[in-house]
Amino acid sequence: MAEAANVRQNLQNVPSIFEISASETLDNLIYPALSKIFDYFGLRLDFKLWGSLRIQEELSPLLTWLLQYLYLRKRASSFGESFYGLQRTVTTTGDLLNRRQQFASATLLTFMPYVERKLRTRITRHEDTSPWEQRLLSAFHAFHAAKAAHTFFYLVKYASNHSPIFRLLGLTLRYPSEPPKEDQWTYVVLKMLEVLAFFLQFVQWWYSNDQRRKVGGTLINPEAMPRKQLPKEVQQSLPQRGECPVCLLSIQTPTACSVSGYVFCWKCIVSHMKEHGTCPVTHYPISLDDLVRIYET
Amino acid sequence: MSTPARRRLMRDFKRLQEDPPTGVSGAPTDNNIMIWNAVIFGPHDTPFEDGTFKLTIEFTEEYPNKPPTVRFVSKVFHPNVYADGGICLDILQNRWSPTYDVSAILTSIQSLLSDPNPNSPANSTAAQLYKENRREYEKRVKACVEQSFID
């Protein structure tokens, strides 16, 4: 009888794989939601906020880290785990996290996805990746395989933690035995952050709608970008009958510079871009991603 | 042999002949299309009026991605023209664009004669006179105009 009660207690204290999976999904939503918010405000504030795009790219993971660290400090769980009422405990002793484990958890939780995202971005853009980057990506593949194996073992109750990261840190997930003791200020802040969680879901839904609109919806007619005022000599030099502004001959392999809208020969614009990094007509900075091949039917 | 630079220069020459701008002219030397001789007539209503100033333009195979080297052969008293005839003009240096053809270059230099930029002087005497003693400046300019008749 006592043994049966003890078994039931243990089973009730162990979260199911579905709650863990849901909490991980919520954690993974933070970065794209923040990026989407930055994009929105960035576009509204100033179109030429171009230089600070890098800052935005680095600001989102930093804010994500701060959010996760706050939750790990106050509730011994990540943002997503806290939302589903879970808590991280030391596997052997059942104690809560110490400072070092909090820091390590937040860092691994935030920057492993960040590094992987960077690697995949570079590979999809066909940039020259060095051998160590290839090996690092292979390591990520191995990690995901190990995680899948861990999840399976956890599902069949063979392992006490669901992820290699948790095994590495010596942690496991449990339901807290008593409600968290917090002061008023902490309670208010964490409640506001939980409201933010619903907002994240809304942003995801909005983003999906946004993408769907872009694919098949009706396009509002955008205002044409104003034409840059060129010096008089340049205006007079530009060809009148559709020739390439650089070689002044018939355009071969037409390529548009999406930053300025002018069309050049592929060879002319690429050689100029590699040397100067600017549009030949407007001097706006351009990169290879700004060149658009134009096909004639 | 035909290279992008030479094809572009033949195009520039053709445009210069078909649609000649006012007050400037130019043509390649007989045996080398990479070296041009040009003439700029002094703009009206300026001290340079009636002057005929000769220039040489040297192109490289990197043209039009790199600007040519342009020098006055005639003596020119101007804040932005060096003693050796070199020209201090932004579109021939950091603000060069491959869309400038020979016609645009010569027209820009002609405009420079009307509107000097004394803040980046190539000839400090001319820049100083232009700012402080306009009468003496114009007298010196007229002297080089008369000199250009003889050349």
Swiss-Prot record, chain A:
Its main location: membrane. Keywords: Membrane, Metal-binding, Peroxisome, Protein transport, Transmembrane, Transmembrane helix, Transport, Ubl conjugation pathway, Zinc, Zinc-finger. GO terms for molecular function: protein transmembrane transporter activity; ubiquitin protein ligase activity; ubiquitin-protein transferase activity; zinc ion binding. It comes from the Eukaryota. The chain crosses the membrane at residues 17-44, 49-73, 99-119, 125-158, 192-219. The keyword Zinc-finger applies. GO terms for cellular component: peroxisomal importomer complex; peroxisomal membrane; peroxisome. It is a multi-pass membrane protein. Pathway: Protein modification; protein ubiquitination. One of its GO terms (biological process) is protein polyubiquitination. InterPro entries: PEX12, Pex_N, Znf_RING/FYVE/PHD. The keyword Disulfide bond does not apply. Residues 1-16, 74-98, 159-191 are peroxisomal matrix. Zn(2+) binds at residues 244, 247, 265, 268. Residues 45-48, 120-124, 220-297 are cytoplasmic. Gene3D superfamilies: Zinc/RING finger domain, C3HC4 (zinc finger) (3.30.40.10). A zinc finger (RING-type) spans 244-283. Component of the PEX2-PEX10-PEX12 retrotranslocation channel. Belongs to the pex2/pex10/pex12 family. Component of a retrotranslocation channel required for peroxisome organization by mediating export of the PEX5 receptor from peroxisomes to the cytosol, thereby promoting PEX5 recycling. The retrotranslocation channel is composed of PEX2, PEX10 and PEX12; each subunit contributing transmembrane segments that coassemble into an open channel that specifically allows the passage of PEX5 through the peroxisomal membrane. PEX12 also regulates PEX5 recycling by activating the E3 ubiquitin-protein ligase activity of PEX10. PANTHER family: PEROXISOME ASSEMBLY PROTEIN 12, PEROXISOME ASSEMBLY PROTEIN 12 PEROXIN-12. The three subunits of the retrotranslocation channel (PEX2, PEX10 and PEX12) coassemble in the membrane into a channel with an open 10 Angstrom pore. The RING-type zinc-fingers that catalyze PEX5 receptor ubiquitination are positioned above the pore on the cytosolic side of the complex. The RING-type zinc-finger is degenerated and only coordinates one zinc ions, preventing E3 ubiquitin-protein ligase activity. This is Peroxisome assembly protein 12. It comes from Drosophila melanogaster. The gene is Pex12.
UniProtKB/Swiss-Prot annotation, chain B:
It catalyses: S-ubiquitinyl-[E1 ubiquitin-activating enzyme]-L-cysteine + [E2 ubiquitin-conjugating enzyme]-L-cysteine = [E1 ubiquitin-activating enzyme]-L-cysteine + S-ubiquitinyl-[E2 ubiquitin-conjugating enzyme]-L-cysteine. InterPro entries: Ub_conjugating_enzyme, UBQ-conjugat_E2_core, UBQ-conjugating_AS, UBQ-conjugating_enzyme/RWD. Keywords: ATP-binding, DNA damage, DNA repair, Nucleotide-binding, Nucleus, Transferase, Ubl conjugation pathway. PROSITE patterns: UBC_1, UBC_2. Disruption phenotype: Lethality during the second instar-early third instar larval stages. Mutants show defective synaptic function as a consequence of mitochondrial failure. The active site is at 88 (glycyl thioester intermediate). One of its GO terms (molecular function) is ubiquitin conjugating enzyme activity. One of its GO terms (biological process) is negative regulation of DNA damage response, signal transduction by p53 class mediator. It comes from the Eukaryota. It is an enzyme of class 2 (transferase). This is Ubiquitin-conjugating enzyme E2-17 kDa. It comes from Drosophila melanogaster. The lineage of its organism: Eukaryota, Metazoa, Ecdysozoa, Arthropoda, Hexapoda.
